[in-house]
């Protein structure tokens, strides 16, 4: 993994990162030989902005992730898989954080992903399953610093996941969904346990039914 960044006096920090990964195979070919690992390469270029006079952090990034040597159906028509498949994903990531006051913090994020089978016996040009193009979230929390409830933090947020393809053949679509989350946290420093807290996180507070 490699990362290059440089912060300017105005609070702008452009950066570029490159990383590689691999995933060992667990299947074998027609001769009983274990397949070679699949490999991943990711490029990311972005900008982070932290103004000197305001508690705000804004980031934006473009990325491309390519996964090669994936298993795919044998073009010869056998029941065995062969190596050589490739999936590429390109996208945009945006995030903003702000402390509106000493007690109030908010976070918002958005991700756009364009994923495609670039090399595959059966699925070339299709979108991989369960990869939504759009995802977004908003979160806010409020912390009490005075009174009998001092140290208590209450938070809530909304997460949106866009529609996605349900299978590699793209024969059906899984619908989008939105869920609400919540948080209650108490800082135990108020009872002599500095550095510790107890928290309750509730995902999907409204018990929304959805397919993921």
Language-model regions: role of each:
Residues 18-24, 51, 62-68, 90, ...:
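Transmembrane beta-strands of outer-membrane beta-barrel pores
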Residues 64, 83-167:
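Gram-negative outer-membrane beta-barrel transporters
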